[in-house]
Curated annotation (Swiss-Prot):
Classification via InterPro entries: Globin (IPR000971), Globin-like_sf (IPR009050), Globin/Proto (IPR012292), Globin_lamprey/hagfish (IPR013314)
Disulfide feature: none
Quaternary structure and interacting proteins, as annotated: Monomer.
Positions of heme b binding: 74, 106
Domain Globin stretches: 11-150
Entries under Pfam families matching the protein: Globin
GO molecular function, one term: oxygen carrier activity
Protein name as it appears in the record: Globin-2
Family classification: Belongs to the globin family.
PANTHER family: CYTOGLOBIN, CYTOGLOBIN-1-RELATED
UniProt keyword terms in alphabetical order: Heme, Iron, Metal-binding, Oxygen transport, Transport
Length: 150
């Protein structure tokens, strides 16, 4: 299933949740490195997205991005937000509240273009569980909630 950022998706089945947890546990064990790798891949593949991050100005190479403490800090925030969503799969109300709060911040304080949530979600999905429909469904849920304040 392709990742979507509007509408709705069907609830995750228990089997999908178990598969997501197993795949995510592997990625999250090394969350600092994997988070940075994901964010670097995002910025090198989508350089226009850096415009929303003034602290990242001038970081034009993968090596420069990886060495930046600001990039590492933001990568950790992203990976931990996904981890919170994975941990909240059985409590979608909790997941919704956290992600809707992030949506408001990104829409009203940071003015991030919501199209980038879907791009980043695709990179996270490809890194964690390439081609897995359940993980893509979770990423869709996250994108839909992150787009809710737009």
């Amino acid at each position: 299933m392709p990742i979507v950022d509007s509408g709705s998706v069907s609830p995750l089945s228990d089997a999908e949740k178990n598969k997501i947890r197993a795949a995510w546990d592997i990625v999250y064990k090394n969350y600092e490195k994997n988070g940075v790798d994901i964010l670097v891949k995002f910025f090198t593949g989508t350089p226009a997205a850096q415009a929303f991050f003034p602290k990242f100005k001038g970081l034009t190479t993968a090596d420069a991005l990886k060495k930046s403490s600001d990039v590492r800090w933001h990568a950790e925030r992203i990976i931990n937000a996904v981890n919170d969503a994975v941990k909240s799969m059985d409590d979608t109300e909790k997941m919704s509240m956290k992600l809707q709060e992030l949506s408001v911040k990104h829409a009203q304080s940071f003015y991030v273009d919501r199209q980038y949530f879907k791009v980043l979600a695709g990179i996270i999905a490809d890194t964690t569980a390439p081609g897995d429909a359940g993980f893509e469904k979770l990423m869709s849920m996250i994108c839909i909630l992150l787009s809710s304040a737009y």
